[in-house]
A protein has these predicted regions:
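Non-catalytic, mostly N-terminal accessory regions of nucleic-acid modification and defense proteins
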Residues: 1-159, 233, 240
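SAM/dcSAM-binding transferase cores
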Residues: 255-276
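Conserved S-adenosyl-L-methionine
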Residues: 162-260
């Protein structure tokens, strides 16, 4: 509504500052996908599906996730979490930061409880494009390992599967798209792929996003589930903002190609997208 009325994005100096709008950070992420070198334009691809209501002719832009966190990006995340702590525990800082980030990326409609002054500092200092340029599940590591050697809560004892193990599991479970035809690669985009046994922060689903636009998960920990949606907004928008079924169903493969889709679907199907 603000953009429609003013023709521009909200600013920090506006009567209602930019960070008070749900999804204020999404335009930056979309633009990063579009212009940053070596970053696949997955947001552009996602929007080219939603606007005309059908799948484009080109296959899914491929993304390579790092095996571990990028050093400087992780260091900056630690700094932003300490800023969000506002003299409280670092665990509280992390949950505050995740809450703030979820609202900024519109995967949550609940505004953060942080003081406005802290939100302004975060708005001025946080550069989410660092994470976009160095794709990895950073919060999965942070939730399980903490910051440096200080006290850490992790009350639900969340410990993610290492990314390289996830990569191996994905290679064993999912079709190898480097060995099939372009038509089969495009057909697999509508296959339903799920991680139903506790999808965690979404590592398996992020890897599967190179194959499918129909990703499903199940996670009971609300903090961890929120992180998986944040990861989706950063790296695989169809995980955080699912493509409507009528679009995917209108592009279902036919004849011989259907068998490839069905094999993938039957192996990993779960009833629902990212569920609690």
């Amino acid at each position: 509504k603000f953009v429609a009325q003013t023709g521009r994005l909200p600013r920090l100096s506006d009567p209602i500052p930019a960070h008070h709008y749900a999804g204020w950070a999404l335009p930056m992420i979309m633009e990063g996908h579009r212009i940053l070198p070596d970053v696949p334009d997955r947001w552009g691809y996602h929007l080219r599906i939603l606007e005309p209501q059908h799948l484009p002719d080109e296959p899914i832009p491929q993304i390579h996730f790092l095996s571990g966190p990028h050093h400087d990006t992780l260091k900056h995340l630690h700094q932003w979490i300490r800023l969000a702590a506002n003299h409280q525990s670092t665990w509280t800082g992390m949950t505050n930061f995740i809450e703030w980030l979820a609202y900024a990326l519109q995967v949550s409609q609940t505004p953060t409880r942080l003081d406005d002054a802290i939100q302004v500092e975060l708005y001025q200092h946080v550069n989410l494009l660092e994470m976009v340029q160095h794709p990895y599940d950073y919060f999965g590591d942070i939730i399980s390992e903490g910051l440096d050697n200080g006290p850490w809560a992790n009350p639900n004892k969340f410990y993610p599967t290492p990314m390289e193990i996830c990569r191996l599991m994905a290679a064993m479970t999912l079709p190898d798209i480097t060995k099939v035809s372009l038509q089969k690669i495009k057909n697999l985009r509508t296959a339903k792929i799920a991680d139903p046994a506790g999808s965690g922060t979404g590592r398996m689903l992020l890897l599967a996003s190179n194959i499918s636009l129909s990703l499903y998960g199940c996670e009971k920990d609300p903090l961890v589930r929120t992180v998986s949606l944040i990861n989706g907004a950063l790296y695989a928008p169809w995980l955080a903002f699912p493509i409507p079924d009528h679009i995917l169903e209108s592009d279902l493969p036919t004849d011989a190609a259907t068998s490839d889709n069905a094999t993938c679907t039957q192996a990993l199907l779960a009833p629902g997208h990212l569920q609690a």
